[in-house]
């Protein structure tokens, strides 16, 4: 059964994005998890188009997004301006934040509990 919340991983590296995706999919098989890493031409970096595709292709209407560096966050915020999805952005470590969130979504945890837990690992 599809969950109402999904997880989106955004990294400057396609290998990092795919690796985080693979790790969290193991513990959250029912959660829609999408990712984008690198630029369209395979270089290190991020782009609006790949970030937009990762967010829009997620099956959930509400997505928690996790990123590695500043321009990834900037692209998420830009997509947020045009997307009809509810985009939830925390400044949490990409692996730990995504893993903890996906596990809690898998267990049908309430969004306010997920948010409270993410705040404990948030990077300020």
Curated annotation (Swiss-Prot):
Instruction: Say yes or no: keyword Acetylation present.
Output: no
Q: Which of the seven top EC classes does this enzyme belong to? A: transferase
Name a GO CC annotation attached to this entry.
membrane
Q: Look up the EC number in the record and give it.
A: 2.7.1.121
Domain PTS EIIA type-4, residue spans: 4-124
Reaction(s) catalysed (UniProt annotation): dihydroxyacetone + phosphoenolpyruvate = dihydroxyacetone phosphate + pyruvate
Q: Which residues form the active site?
A: 12 (tele-phosphohistidine intermediate)
Give the UniProt record's GO annotations in the biological process aspect.
glycerol catabolic process; phosphoenolpyruvate-dependent sugar phosphotransferase system
Q: Which UniProt keywords apply?
A: Cytoplasm, Glycerol metabolism, Kinase, Phosphotransferase system, Transferase
> Please, which domain of life does this record's source organism belong to?
Bacteria
Where does this polypeptide localize? Cytoplasm
Would I find Kinase among this entry's keywords? Answer: yes
Cited SUPFAM superfamilies: PTS system fructose IIA component-like (SSF53062)
One of the entry's Gene Ontology molecular-function terms is: phosphoenolpyruvate-glycerone phosphotransferase activity
Q: Which Pfam families match?
A: EIIA-man
Q: Output the InterPro entries linked to this UniProt entry.
A: DhaM, DhaM_N, PTS_EIIA_man-typ, PTS_EIIA_man-typ_sf
Q: What is known of its domains?
A: The EIIA type-4 domain is phosphorylated by phospho-HPr on a histidyl residue. Then, it transfers the phosphoryl group to the EIIB type-4 domain.
Something else the entry says is: Unlike the carbohydrate-specific transporters of the PTS, the complex DhaKML has no transport activity.
Known partners and oligomeric status: Homodimer. The dihydroxyacetone kinase complex is composed of a homodimer of DhaM, a homodimer of DhaK and the subunit DhaL.
Role according to the record:
Component of the dihydroxyacetone kinase complex, which is responsible for the phosphoenolpyruvate (PEP)-dependent phosphorylation of dihydroxyacetone. DhaM serves as the phosphoryl donor. Is phosphorylated by phosphoenolpyruvate in an EI- and HPr-dependent reaction, and a phosphorelay system on histidine residues finally leads to phosphoryl transfer to DhaL and dihydroxyacetone.
Q: What is this protein called?
A: PEP-dependent dihydroxyacetone kinase 1, phosphoryl donor subunit DhaM
User: What is the originating organism of this protein?
Assistant: Listeria innocua serovar 6a (strain ATCC BAA-680 / CLIP 11262)
Supply the gene name: dhaM-1
